[in-house]
Amino acid sequence: MSATDLDPEPDPESSKGQIRQANELLILQAAEKVFARAGFGGATMAAIATASGLPKANVHYYFGSKEVLYRQVLAQILSDWLAPTRCITVDAEPRLAIEQYIRAKMALAKLRPDGSKVFANELLHGAPVVKALLQTDLRDLVASKAAVIQSWVNAGRMARVNGTHLFFTIWAATQTYADFDVQVCAVLGNSSLSLEDHDEATEHVVSLVLRGCGL
């Protein structure tokens, strides 16, 4: 008996699950791009299907409607934005934690600019889809992380800053490189942001925020 004789037979259901996950990811990535360029109103399931390279029927099969897909895209963007806050804990070194968070946000601005634009456009229209998430998940997380920052302030580990407004400042400073990249490029005289431009911007934001925090 060979070793391969002992290998379990491939599970068809497992394979189907992997295919579904791969297709859903393709569709979500395509939808992010289409929503960023056309907005919710201008986007169509046909355009998303074309961008994903999958039949339109598949897009409807996995997500049902444009509204469902849009909600899923927004929820995923918010989840990805909140994940980097894990480094902000009471026992963490304030300078390292804040720097790590800023660098993560700048990386997202570079790697997922379309996601940032979709979210910004949603907010500019009054957040009709994500308002509940903003008032619950986001508000609760910011409150808990602002409490961590306040504990650092109370312990004399950093300058006296308002933790909640610190997050607003970081979001504005990092997301501008995605949401307003056209403006940034125009002022810099470039057709697009180069790796050097992004690195310089990252170091600038890190330095500015850390100095403002007395770190």
What are the functions of these language-model segments?
Residues R71-Q100, V142, V148-Q150:
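Amphipathic alpha-helical linker/stalk segments
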